[in-house]
Amino acid sequence: MCDVVLGSQWGDEGKGKLVDLLCDDIDVCARCQGGNNAGHTIVVGDVKYDFHMLPSGLVNPNCLNLVGSGVVVHVPSFFQELENLEKKGLNCRDRLFLSSRAHLVFDFHQRTDKLKEAELSENKKAIGTTGKGIGPTYSTKASRSGIRVHHLVSEDPEAWEEFKTRYHRLVNSRKQRYGEFDYDVEEELARYEKYRELLRPFVVDSIEFMHTALVQNKRILVEGANALMLDIDFGTYPYVTSSSTGIGGVLTGLGIPPKTINNIYGVVKAYTTRVGEGPFPTEQLNEFGEALQTIGAEYGVTTGRKRRCGWLDLVVLKYSTLINGYTSLNITKLDVLDSFKEIQVGVGYKLNGKSLASFPEDLIKLGKVEVEYKTLPGWETDITKIKTYDELPENAKSYLKFIEDYLGVPVQWVGTGPARDSMLEKPISK
């Protein structure tokens, strides 16, 4: 059976830390979608490991790790990330596998990503992408003109010529749209000829890989990237990523049936953050937002961009819960709220004086909503040294209980600091 870790807000919730905790007891960790536009930081002892494309389970020496079919892979970044982990002492090369069906991100995808974003900026409609080429790669995938891993590593005598043909076709179509690129596309092609041999040992048939693990009753953890509110279908479109970031993306990105899913863990930051453009109803453009940003050290792992900050939005989380069906929650960074005398929580939206029954799909409406807040008392106590859930201040427990009652989902873990062991587990009834 598979357990799944998913982001429930706009990303940066701290999914990697829960994955790291759960990886102590699993056999396989799999990424199902996204690319190196995601970012996790995991702290083991005094060492920080940054993950963008590769599964966080690599920190566990007994865990096999799969980059699934739904992931889009920039090969130079794949090897750079692997080398960075190895430099920090992780011996993980023989535990990393890549789906033969995953699509490849090329440098021209990244160039077109930035060029398109620049065009949109002129009309003040920029998405705020990471510029990693993720969107353009999913676009070529959807138009059936993309290049997959198996096209690169195939040992068929005609495979390399076919790869070159596909590559030039993609490059030329982008040149027609954007003009000449500011780099040598033939040099990139030559690099990929070398990558053929380097990448081949990692490549597997991920369908066979996953179903063999399931038949053998291996304990499998699926690591979602980004978060539900960035989902291509259910997020705040068009200010979203280009993949399915919810539970549906797990099934399509790994090729597994729904009946194999056991627990679905929703990771929730104790307040709300967002990187890039797009609506953010509970955003605080004031001293509260600045305090959350400063205390929480809210900078993106992938881009280094300052994150926008605001109060917890339970309307967003209810919507997220309806789609993903969380079985329990991990509330992260609760300690960031330690110094607040009062804490506000968004519990409803009003538009033109009328309460909305659901999260609006129309961004014009969403931009005009008035958030209804519930004010809860803070605990004004340092919780970073606390080791058990029972030791939490009563007001902190009340804050967590309020979230549970609103969503109808139990809180199972509470993050109280950046360290690997700064996570309290709360017993829940199944």
Swiss-Prot record:
GO annotation terms (biological process): 'de novo' AMP biosynthetic process; IMP metabolic process
Protein name: Adenylosuccinate synthetase
Gene Ontology cellular-component terms listed: cytoplasm
Reactions mediated catalytically: IMP + L-aspartate + GTP = N(6)-(1,2-dicarboxyethyl)-AMP + GDP + phosphate + 2 H(+)
Lineage: Eukaryota, Fungi, Dikarya, Ascomycota, Saccharomycotina
Cofactor: binding comment: Binds 1 Mg(2+) ion per subunit.
PANTHER family named among the record's database cross-references: ADENYLOSUCCINATE SYNTHETASE
Assembly and oligomerization: Homodimer.
Active-site residues per Swiss-Prot or TrEMBL entry: 12 (proton acceptor), 40 (proton donor)
Originating organism: Scheffersomyces stipitis (strain ATCC 58785 / CBS 6054 / NBRC 10063 / NRRL Y-11545) (Yeast)
